[in-house]
C-alpha cells in the first residue's frame, strides 16, 4: 500500500497525534481510570487470539531485551511506531514483518524496536499499557503480533482486561504480571516516552518506521511501504 493511500483516510488521526505529547499527563490519568474499569466495560464478545502457535514460532530463538528484538549488535535498528488499534499496523504485522524477521532479524542484520502510541482512543491506551508489561517480560513482539491477530473494531471497548489477558496468554506472556504492571507509573512512563519521541521525530501517523544505521543517521518511512522500507535499510548499512 502506498504512503499516500495509507495517510489519506488517516489524516484525522494524524492531526490528533500532535496533541498527545501536550496532554501526556492527562492521558495518564485517563488511562488509570479506563484500565481499572477495563474488565467490566461493555464490549463485544472477546475475539479469539488466533494464530498463536505460528505467531510464537516466528519469534523462536530470537532474543528480545527491553523491547529490542534481535542481535543487540545488529548494525541497523528499525523502530516501529504503532497504535495497537491501527488496522494498517495489523496488516503490516501480518504481511511485512514476518519476512523482515526471517530475512533480516534472524540473520543478525537488523534489530527491531517498537513504540506503542495511543492516539486512536482508550482501547489504545489499555493495550499500550499491557504491551509495556509484555516488554518487561521480553515478550513485546509476540504480544503485538497476537494483539493484531485478534484486533477488534476501533474504539468499541473491546480491549477489556479479559481480552488483554487472552492475548497475553496466547503470546506466552504472564498475563497476571502484565496486567499488574499496566497499572504502574513505570508503564505510564513508557507511554509518555513513546509519545514524546514521536513528537520529537515528527511522527504523526502509524505505522511509521525510523531506520538507523551505525552512523546514527535516521531514515523515516511512513506507512505500509515495503519498497521504501527496503531502501531505507540499504541506505542505513
Q: Predicted segments — roles?
A:
Residues 2-47, 169-237:
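C-terminal cap of thioredoxin/glutaredoxin-like
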Residues 39-63:
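N-terminal low-complexity, Pro/Thr-rich disordered segments
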Residues 56, 73-75, 127, 205-206:
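A structure-centric signal for secondary-structure junctions around beta-strands
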Residues 59-76:
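A short beta-strand-turn-helix
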Residues 64, 96-98, 196:
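Alpha-helical scaffolding within the catalytic cores
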Residues 71, 80, 94, 222-223:
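Conserved strand-loop elements at the edges of beta-sheets that form or border functional pockets
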Residues 74, 82-169:
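Structural alpha/beta surface segment adjacent to cysteine/selenocysteine redox centers
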Residues 78, 86, 209:
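Conserved S/T- and glycine-rich ATP-binding loop of Class I adenylate-forming
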Amino acid at each position: 500500500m502506498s504512503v499516500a493511500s495509507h495517510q489519506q483516510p488517516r489524516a484525522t488521526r494524524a492531526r490528533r497525534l500532535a496533541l498527545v505529547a501536550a496532554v501526556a499527563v492527562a492521558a495518564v490519568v485517563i488511562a488509570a481510570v479506563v484500565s481499572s474499569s477495563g474488565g467490566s466495560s461493555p464490549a463485544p464478545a472477546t475475539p479469539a487470539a488466533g494464530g498463536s502457535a505460528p505467531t510464537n514460532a516466528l519469534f523462536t530463538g530470537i532474543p528480545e531485551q527491553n523491547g529490542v528484538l534481535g542481535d543487540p549488535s545488529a548494525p541497523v535498528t528499525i523502530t516501529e511506531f504503532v497504535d495497537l488499534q491501527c488496522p494498517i499496523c495489523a496488516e503490516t504485522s501480518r504481511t511485512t514483518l514476518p519476512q523482515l524477521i526471517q530475512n533480516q532479524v534472524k540473520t543478525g542484520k537488523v534489530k527491531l524496536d517498537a513504540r506503542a502510541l495511543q492516539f486512536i482512543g482508550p482501547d489504545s491506551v489499555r493495550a499500550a499499557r499491557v504491551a509495556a508489561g509484555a516488554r518487561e517480560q521480553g515478550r513485546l513482539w509476540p504480544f503485538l503480533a497476537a494483539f493484531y491477530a485478534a484486533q477488534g473494531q476501533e474504539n468499541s471497548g473491546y480491549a477489556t482486561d479479559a481480552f488483554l489477558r487472552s492475548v497475553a496468554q496466547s503470546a506466552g506472556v504472564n498475563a497476571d504480571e502484565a496486567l499488574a504492571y499496566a497499572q504502574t507509573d513505570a508503564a505510564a512512563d513508557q507511554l509518555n516516552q513513546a509519545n514524546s519521541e514521536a513528537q520529537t521525530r515528527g511522527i504523526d501517523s502509524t505505522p511509521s518506521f525510523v531506520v538507523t544505521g551505525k552512523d546514527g543517521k535516521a531514515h523515516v518511512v511512513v506507512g505500509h511501504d515495503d519498497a521504501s522500507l527496503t531502501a531505507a535499510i540499504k541506505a542505513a548499512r
